Amino acid sequence: GLCALLSALAKQPIYQHLAVTGAVDQFGNVQPVGGLNEKIEGFFRVCSIQGLNGKQGVVIPESNQLQLILSDEVIEAVKNGQFHIYPVSHVEEAVELLMGCPAGSIDDDQTLFGRIRERLDDLNGSAGRNGLFSTLFRRLHSLVGLA
């Protein structure tokens, strides 16, 4: 949900060859989830049916790595570079993988957070940096330690 929201706010599409799972706390830390093996195996099966192209993969919580017990078929595909498993510990890492754009700084329009700030300024009708949405986003950004 969070990555979809960030994508919509920034007007930055999410790659469709990657699946993502995990929970995120209020500071952007990615938390472990259950059923990870089944989620990976399920997405792998879908990708296999459509044809593995070396781009497909799953973004998972880093803290779940030790619980992975995957089929030999998935392990072989990962070893051969046909399927990928990307462990992440923070939402900023996931954003870069999923959108090909660094999360970055709200002051840099070439980053996801900069694009979001710019979009919120536009929605607020404020070309400046003192608009309501921009101010709220800056405060939220600094509160969660992303600044």
Locations of the language-model features?
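Peripheral, non-AAA+ core regions of ATP-driven protein-machinery
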Residues: G1-A147
